């Protein structure tokens, strides 16, 4: 459960990210593919080379979904229901991959905003990404 302090940290961080969310999403996705090569199996039709337009575009989709979630911290299941359906029923993404991408998102944000990435912000973002991952995998059961 996200506390009021977590929600404030998440919103403040997302405000600082601003227009870079899509860029960071693409970078985090590239980092995920490089660090965890098995995640590439879900994208056989993509050019997965560094700087690929397809990876950047999908990274922007990830960032857009997270931006939507930031705007609905009190109702993540409602906000992400369609995305949960897509990943569970159509794409059938292994739930562990959300954890791997979440880790790479944290690393990417820490690299770009080291001064703002305090232990409290790190913990809040980790809880947020875990909450989003939980919602996205909730329909697997």
UniProtKB/Swiss-Prot annotation:
Residues where Phosphoserine is found: 3, 35, 49, 102, 124, 131, 138
Recorded hits in InterPro entries, A to Z, give: Globin (IPR000971), Globin-like_sf (IPR009050), Globin/Proto (IPR012292), Hemoglobin_a-typ (IPR002338), Hemoglobin_oxygen_transport (IPR050056), Hemoglobin_pi (IPR002339)
Residues given in the record as O2 binding sites:
58
Instruction: Write down which residues bear the modification named Phosphotyrosine.
Output: 24
> Which GO terms fall under biological process for this protein?
hydrogen peroxide catabolic process
Question: Superkingdom of this entry's organism?
Answer: Eukaryota
Q: Which residues carry this modification: N6-succinyllysine?
A: 7, 11, 16, 40
Q: Where is the Globin domain?
A: 1-141
User: Which CDD domains would you find in this protein's record?
Assistant: Hb-alpha-like
Binding, heme b: 87
Question: What is the protein name for this chain?
Answer: Hemoglobin subunit alpha
The record's gene field reads HBA
């Amino acid at each position: 459960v996200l506390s009021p302090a977590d929600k404030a940290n998440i919103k403040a961080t997302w405000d600082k990210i601003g227009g870079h969310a899509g860029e960071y999403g693409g970078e985090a996705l590239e980092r995920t593919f490089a660090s965890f090569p098995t995640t590439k199996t879900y994208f056989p039709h993509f050019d997965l080379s560094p700087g690929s337009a397809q990876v950047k575009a999908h990274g922007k989709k990830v960032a857009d979904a997270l931006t939507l979630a930031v705007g609905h911290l009190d109702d993540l299941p409602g906000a992400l229901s369609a995305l949960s359906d897509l990943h569970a029923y159509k794409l059938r993404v292994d739930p562990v991959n959300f954890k791997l991408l979440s880790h790479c998102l944290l690393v990417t944000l820490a690299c770009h905003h080291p001064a703002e990435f305090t232990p409290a912000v790190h913990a809040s973002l980790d809880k947020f990404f875990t909450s989003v991952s939980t919602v996205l995998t909730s329909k697997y059961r």
